[in-house]
Amino acid sequence: MDRAGPRTVMELGVALMGAGLLLAPLTREPWHLYLTLGVLVGGGSVCLGYSGQSLFLPYWFVRRRGLAMGLAFAGVGVGSITLLPWMQLLIESAGWRAACVAMGLLVLVVLVPINLLLRKRPQDVGLQPDGDAAPPPGVAARPASNVVDTAWAAVDWTLGRAMRTARFWWIAFGYFCGLYAWYAVQVHQTKYLIEVGFTPIVAAWALGLVSLAGIPGQIALGHLSDRIGREWVWTASSLGFVVCYLALILLQQSPTELLLYVMIAAQGVLGYGLTSIFGAIVAEIFEGRHYGSIFGTLMLAAIIGGAAGPWVTGALYDLLGSYTLAFWIGAGLSGLSTLAVWRASPRKVRVVAGRVHRLAPRSA
């Protein structure tokens, strides 16, 4: 992304995902599925999803960075609600192979032309961040007014320099814990709800409602982060996962609809807000020419956490015959992720638009 820009990265993602979906129907061995739906589609989704979008959206928006990213990532929920039922109907009527071909063609036809319109920075097409007017010819652009730590912001942050700071590792730890908690519950909640007494249909609908609730949650919390700061919204989102885990634990003793809806609302409306500020936190601490490589490396920690969460949760269930300890661990790691983001303290480098008026002229 730092060298080639979003069009190359996104179109690579389209090619990988399209190839994986179109080749999957030709599989004859299990490893064929691992390669097509696992490696190719999985790799494509990394380029096209949260990681890919977060690599260039922060360049386009400063004052409304959280809102912009919340709107972008809310599309995941919209896609889940609209496309998954269609895919299910197609699988039931024509089989999974036909469904893969249809989805592969849809990905290629829709995303290839759309991604050709992408640019890394607004300056590449004569614009300014947030839609501001460009300065007159010969007049330098006014420097950003949201910088708190001028010495830190003046550094040309490379990946190597970033990795030698405590902030980098606090972010990595926070992202690991955050995605551990997210994917641990997302992968196991349907099975758990059936286990405590809900019907398979209700359990499946609960997961769908979480995605639905996440749409306004991501947008609202992204906007809120532009007003009060990234740390506070990360705290609210992590609290959502803590409440979600506590509700799941209580459901074991009292499987009521009220607790089910509390779990859904906490996870969707609050928890999904994490995605709205993933890129913003890193951009405000390590903004610069090498932001892409820094963010991409930090997302490795997030991906490892997202993979570890479901695996550890499943292993503990197999060992103990219960999800209780695993859910307590998820809740605890949500709390630790909050501590880590506060320690990284993006507000001490650059403040959000809603706090700019509180800045007093100073240098670090």
Labelled PLM ranges:
Residues 1, 82-94, 193-194, 224-225, ...:
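Interfacial helix-cap and linker-helix signal at transmembrane-aqueous boundaries
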Residues 76-124:
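Helix-loop-helix hairpin linking two adjacent transmembrane segments in secondary transporters
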Residues 20, 32-48, 176, 258-273:
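Hydrophobic core of transmembrane alpha-helices in multi-pass small-molecule transporters
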Residues 104-146, 340-345:
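C-terminal membrane-cytosol helix-exit motif in multi-pass small-molecule transporters
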Residues 160-223, 309, 313:
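Extracytoplasmic gate region of multi-pass secondary transporters
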Residues 15-28, 240-253:
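C-terminal ends and interior cores of transmembrane alpha-helices
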Residues 45-61, 273-286:
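Intracellular juxtamembrane helix-capping segments at the cytosolic ends
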